[in-house]
């Protein structure tokens, strides 16, 4: 999958392709994290959940239906029982539209507007371009809080060109997303790791109470850390490779992170159970990857996005973390998008990519004029970028 982004917040233009391990390197406030959030929003927005779609659609129709009945109750001349129904179809909508002609002012306008909303929701299809636009809008709102318009030139149009094995499409954004065509993409899921600090006692709640689906990236990740995937892995070679990498991680951190509905969230080290609140973030960083692998949450169609993993890692562990990621991506065919400004981490990725004969993919944040917006472009080799 490749995206070309123009005039998105701080970013003037960027072209980033997911290929094995892709690394965006550059200083803080250069748009690195923005690209990761765009990928996350697009992948999840273009893969809506059908059960959630049906539930939210029915909730929306029910809400407008109740608003209509509330208006009708205010008119004592109307027998409301005639209009109460469990089948809100075109025939029922036509009755309400005809009845609205007997109203005046605000109530008439509201009845007509509510009927239009219900009709639109009734006609909305799960895999339609309209629904995908709504989904992308929801993710953009969560991730960017509407801070999407170009910062340095508000007159320019925000656009994203999406290129995938399944086809191409252009998304333009002007306070709402507008795809020029309905596109299905290869990736069907994504996880975004910002900080390992979310590994805490609340992970137990993700087993007992957390909803299976959430648009919030932290809740989405926490559910995956606490629950096994529905993805059925029957490839013995893959299972063996996963077990090997989990074992390597266990050796690095001298133990493992356990999430259990009875025991809670623990760090097991040399047979001892340690309160997760007393565990270093570096250990949690490795444990997070360990849990995703154990729960079979990662596969070739799931993009793993990790934002500046070096922040909570000692330089020596940055090197080991880089090796783990290269092994995961090569041995398990897991696509990974990374951002970093650490020379230790960047160089380690280069070294281990060469050691394991694995392709790396580097992009650099470029800002020739300090007060202008950022450009992110591909490089053919690794550089220290601090």
Placement of each model-derived feature along the sequence:
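Switch/communication elements of ASCE P-loop NTPase nucleotide-binding domains
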Residues: 1-49, 266-386
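Phosphate-coordinating catalytic segments in nucleotide- and nucleic-acid-processing enzymes
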Residues: 4, 45-295, 299-301, 369-386
């Amino acid at each position: 999958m490749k995206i070309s982004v123009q005039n998105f917040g701080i970013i003037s233009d960027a072209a980033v392709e997911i290929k094995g391990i892709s690394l965006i390197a550059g200083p803080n406030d250069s748009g690195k994290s923005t690209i990761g959030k765009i990928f996350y929003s697009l992948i999840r927005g273009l893969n809506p959940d059908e059960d959630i779609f049906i539930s939210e659609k029915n909730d929306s129709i029910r809400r407008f239906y109740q608003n209509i009945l509330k208006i009708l109750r205010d008119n004592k001349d109307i027998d409301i029982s005639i209009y109460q129904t469990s089948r809100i179809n075109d025939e029922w909508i036509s009755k309400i539209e005809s009845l609205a002609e007997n109203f005046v002012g605000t109530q008439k306008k509201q009845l007509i507007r509510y009927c239009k909303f219900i009709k639109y929701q009734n006609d909305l299809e799960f895999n339609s371009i309209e629904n995908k636009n709504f989904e992308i809008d929801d993710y953009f709102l969560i991730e960017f809080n509407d801070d999407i318009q170009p910062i340095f030139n508000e007159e320019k149009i925000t656009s994203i060109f999406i290129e995938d094995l399944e086809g191409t499409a252009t998304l333009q954004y002007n306070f709402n997303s507008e795809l020029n065509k309905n596109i299905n993409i290869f990736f069907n899921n994504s996880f975004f790791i910002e900080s390992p600090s979310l590994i805490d006692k609340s992970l137990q709640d993700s087993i007992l109470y957390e909803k299976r689906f959430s648009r919030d990236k932290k809740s989405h990740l926490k559910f995956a850390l606490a629950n096994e995937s529905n993805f059925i892995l029957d490839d013995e070679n893959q299972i063996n490779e996963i077990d090997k990498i989990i074992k390597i991680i266990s050796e690095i951190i001298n133990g493992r992170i356990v999430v259990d509905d009875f025991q809670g969230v623990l760090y097991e080290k040399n047979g001892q159970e340690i309160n997760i609140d007393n565990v270093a973030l570096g250990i949690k960083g490795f444990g997070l990857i360990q849990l995703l692998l154990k729960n079979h949450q990662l596969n070739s169609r799931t993009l793993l996005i990790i934002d500046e993993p070096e922040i909570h890692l000692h330089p020596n562990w940055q090197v080991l973390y880089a090796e783990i990621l290269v092994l995961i991506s090569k041995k398990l065919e897991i696509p990974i998008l990374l951002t970093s400004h650490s020379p230790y981490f960047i160089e380690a990725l280069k070294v281990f990519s060469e050691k394991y004969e694995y392709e790396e993919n580097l992009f650099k944040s470029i800002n020739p004029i300090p007060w202008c917006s950022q450009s992110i472009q591909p490089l053919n080799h690794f550089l220290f970028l601090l």
